[in-house]
């Protein structure tokens, strides 16, 4: 009997929440809410508007450095391996490549936003 009551309670609460979820959005309809929004750009305008190349380059640089950092995440588990020298050498090379890439971007003023 308790199982049936629990199922009925769950079904009734779920049904009420579904009805409320479909009913609430229809109360306040504004033009701003109905319009699509994508990264601050108007999606109905021309798709060939120029954008900042600096923004694109900083975004690509962030993506590359983020992927390199993601390669370092399994490092604590790799330190428990039997060949400690190879693990340490690999992590040192990875961090060195990351540091050299950062130094290269810094020297070529790739990280400066205004220019």
Swiss-Prot record:
InterPro entries listed in its UniProt record: NADH_UbQ/plastoQ_OxRdtase_su3, NDAH_ubi_oxred_su3_sf
Q: Name one Pfam family in it.
A: Oxidored_q4
Top enzyme class:
translocase
Could you provide one GO biological process annotation from this protein's UniProt record? mitochondrial electron transport, NADH to ubiquinone
Q: Give the transmembrane ranges.
A: 4-24, 55-75, 84-104
* Cell location: Mitochondrion inner membrane
Classify the protein's membrane topology as the record does.
Multi-pass membrane protein
Please indicate if the UniProt record lists Nuclease as a keyword.
no
GO molecular function, a single term: NADH dehydrogenase (ubiquinone) activity
What catalytic reaction does the record list? Answer: a ubiquinone + NADH + 5 H(+)(in) = a ubiquinol + NAD(+) + 4 H(+)(out)
User: Which key words are in the record?
Assistant: Electron transport, Membrane, Mitochondrion, Mitochondrion inner membrane, NAD, Respiratory chain, Translocase, Transmembrane, Transmembrane helix, Transport, Ubiquinone
Q: Which GO terms describe its cellular component?
A: mitochondrial inner membrane; NADH dehydrogenase complex
EC number(s) in its UniProt entry?
7.1.1.2
Subunit structure, as described in the record: Core subunit of respiratory chain NADH dehydrogenase (Complex I) which is composed of 45 different subunits. Interacts with TMEM186. Interacts with TMEM242.
Assigned protein family: Belongs to the complex I subunit 3 family.
Q: What does this protein do?
A: Core subunit of the mitochondrial membrane respiratory chain NADH dehydrogenase (Complex I) which catalyzes electron transfer from NADH through the respiratory chain, using ubiquinone as an electron acceptor. Essential for the catalytic activity of complex I.
Record's protein name: NADH-ubiquinone oxidoreductase chain 3
Q: Which organism is it from?
A: Phyllotis darwinii (Darwin's leaf-eared mouse)
